[in-house]
């Protein structure tokens, strides 16, 4: 995809085979530019080509998954650790004390992470890259087609800093079978836009959309440094699962509202998905112009909550700079409901509904 703009490129995967069992993960350790270099960038895009290999190592739609799947890219920090062994502890005592039991060696141990150490001072053998993983990008795979997407994920420049070695982790639900090409494009634009400098993880993970949903997403406190120029809330929110006719609940083909309240109501904002009830939104010209792969099979045309099959999920970004307390703690509250007409209803429990409704949500400041 050539946009005509000049950019620097970081290659994560280059026509690499991605396969394995259900929801297999593939990882790649990448050496990133220095913090000084990263500070020059104000825009970042991710270019994904998820080709489906044929028997000759080429590309063919015939080799693609026939269903829509969630695909995610995470970037993970590295951290120094030490392993402590407890040779006198039995398995029951070990587990009771919160340690881990090595069944092959028959010994109790715990992993202790050490703050403030660099890779150089820690050493490769005591360094774990797979720590503090932040979802960086999200896609929904198409029905039986090969997707190519170019997505603006500029806020996540902050996750690259301070540079050096970082672990990228890609995971797709289902049975993966891809020739994976993934590259970051970094732009040094001559503008007054500040470069994203740091991030603070907020809510993450996939949680059942039921009467306990709000309890599983408690209010979170975050601190804003004194020297910030801009503060943004960034999130990926998509609904999945539909239950059945006896459950009166769904998260994929039904609208839901996600409500955020900053510092006790100083600023409120919300995200909803009115297109989720549409019979044809995902095959509309509007959706295709926003990145949906056309002419798929299956039920690709139905509207969904925050996504379509064969589409890159755009990050939800809200500028909250004017409403945070600079240099002190802030609190963000989050609630969600199922939208029915003009009503905002608590989603009921799923019970025996099949694919129970759930919200896949990751966010950061």
Region locations from a protein language model:
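Extracellular/secretory-pathway and virion-surface proteins
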Residues: 1-85, 92-98, 106-365
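Short Cys/His-rich micro-motifs in 6-15 aa windows
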Residues: 101
């Amino acid at each position: 995809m050539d946009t005509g703009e000049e950019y620097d490129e970081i290659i994560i995967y280059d026509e690499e085979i991605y396969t394995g069992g259900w929801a297999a993960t593939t990882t790649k350790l990448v050496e990133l530019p220095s913090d000084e270099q990263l500070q020059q960038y104000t825009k970042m895009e991710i270019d994904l080509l998820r080709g489906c290999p044929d028997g000759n190592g080429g590309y063919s739609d015939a080799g693609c998954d026939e269903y829509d799947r969630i695909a995610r890219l995470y970037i993970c920090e590295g951290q120094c650790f030490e392993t402590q062994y407890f040779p006198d502890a039995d398995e029951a005592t070990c587990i009771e004390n919160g340690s881990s039991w090595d069944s092959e060696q028959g010994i109790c141990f715990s992993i202790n992470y050490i703050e403030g150490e660099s890779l150089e001072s820690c050493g490769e053998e005591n360094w774990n890259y797979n720590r503090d993983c932040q979802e960086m990008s999200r896609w929904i795979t198409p029905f039986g087609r090969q997707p190519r997407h170019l997505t603006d994920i500029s806020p996540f420049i902050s996750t690259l800093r301070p540079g050096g070695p970082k672990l990228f982790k890609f995971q797709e639900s289902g049975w993966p079978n891809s020739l994976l090409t993934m590259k970051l494009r970094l732009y040094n634009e001559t503008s007054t836009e500040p470069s994203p400098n740091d991030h603070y993880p907020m809510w993450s993970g996939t949680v059942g959309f039921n009467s306990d949903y709000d309890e599983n997403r408690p209010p979170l406190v975050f601190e804003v440094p004194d020297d910030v120029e801009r503060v943004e809330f960034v999130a990926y929110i998509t609904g999945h699962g539909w239950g059945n006719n006896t459950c009166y609940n769904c998260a994929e083909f039904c609208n839901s509202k996600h409500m955020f309240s900053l510092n006790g109501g100083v600023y409120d904002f919300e995200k909803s998905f009115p297109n989720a009830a549409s019979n044809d939104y995902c095959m509309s010209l509007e959706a295709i112009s926003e990145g949906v792969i056309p002419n798929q099979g299956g039920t690709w045309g139905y509207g969904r909550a925050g996504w379509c099959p064969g589409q890159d999920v755009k990050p939800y970004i809200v500028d909250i700079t004017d409403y945070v307390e600079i240099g002190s703690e802030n609190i963000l509250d989050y609630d969600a409901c199922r939208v029915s007409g003009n009503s905002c209803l608590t989603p009921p429990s799923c019970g025996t509904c099949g694919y129970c409704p759930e919200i896949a949500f990751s966010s950061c400041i």
